[in-house]
Structures are given as C-alpha cells and as structure tokens.
C-alpha cells in the first residue's frame, strides 16, 4: 500500500492518539517536513518533546503528547498565501481569531502564520493545529 500524504497521515495519527488519551505516539515514516511541523507545534505548546529514531529505513519520530490538541490536519491543496491574506485563511481553517495556528512553508523555512505575518512574508499553507 502506498502512503500518499505522510504529513496528513502523521497529523491524523497525532489527533487520533490525543482523542484516545495516549501519552506518546510513534510517527513513521519520518521526513524533514514532518520534523519541522513538529518543531512548530512544540514551540506553541501543542506537543512535548519529540525525537528522531533511526530504524534503518525512513526513520520514526517519537512524540510526547500533552492533551492540548483538539484537531490537527494537513491543508490540501497547498494554497499559496500572501503576507496580507493570513486573516482570510485563519477564518477558513481555525475556529476563532487567535485560536490555533496555521503552519506555513516559506522561503525562510517552516513557521506559524503569526511569525510569517510579523516578518511580512508569504508562503504555502501546509497544516493547521488548534
């Protein structure tokens, strides 16, 4: 079976594990994009520590869950967004103003929409978390 979207799979795995009440989850296959998304989620307090475990294949991320995620998902298609248009996308994907984050892939790396707005740069929407 082919895995079409590893990021969407990882985020749904995290969301489902949170709902069941698990304290940690193993995400595979690992990728740089998933690692950067986990870093942003950790920065905003949605997850605890995470680490990369090399299993001789693609690798695995071990993620500590804190029980703070209501929903996390990948945004498909990866919409391009300009620096001044973040509010429109917040209304579409987040339940309330300043509640949750959009994760954006920019020319300066993966970051939240709040950081990208402060820096005045656009990018592509890849995920949301609240």
Swiss-Prot record:
PROSITE patterns: RIBOSOMAL_S8
This protein's GO CC annotations: ribonucleoprotein complex; ribosome
Gene3D superfamilies per record: 3.30.1370.30, 3.30.1490.10
Keyword annotations: Ribonucleoprotein, Ribosomal protein, RNA-binding, rRNA-binding
Cytoplasm in keyword set: no
Presence of the UniProt keyword Cell wall biogenesis/degradation in the record: no
SUPFAM superfamilies cross-referenced by the UniProt entry: Ribosomal protein S8
Name of one Pfam family that matches: Ribosomal_S8
Top-level division of the source organism's lineage: Archaea
Classification via PANTHER family: 40S RIBOSOMAL PROTEIN S15A
Summary of the function given for this chain in its UniProt record: One of the primary rRNA binding proteins, it binds directly to 16S rRNA central domain where it helps coordinate assembly of the platform of the 30S subunit.
Subunit comment: Part of the 30S ribosomal subunit.
Protein's name in the database: Small ribosomal subunit protein uS8
Organism of derivation: Pyrococcus abyssi (strain GE5 / Orsay)
């Amino acid at each position: 079976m082919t895995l079409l979207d590893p990021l969407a799979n990882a985020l749904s795995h995290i969301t489902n594990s949170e709902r069941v009440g698990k304290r940690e989850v193993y995400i595979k296959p690992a990728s740089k994009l998933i690692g950067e998304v986990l870093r942003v989620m950790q920065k905003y307090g949605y997850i605890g520590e995470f680490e990369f475990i090399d299993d001789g294949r693609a690798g695995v991320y071990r993620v500590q869950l804190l029980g703070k995620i209501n929903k996390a998902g990948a945004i498909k298609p990866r919409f391009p967004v300009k620096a001044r248009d973040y509010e429109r996308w917040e209304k579409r994907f987040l339940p309330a103003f300043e509640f949750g984050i959009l994760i954006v892939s920019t020319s300066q790396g993966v970051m939240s929409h709040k950081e990208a707005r402060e820096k005045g740069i656009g990018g592509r929407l890849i995920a949301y978390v609240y």
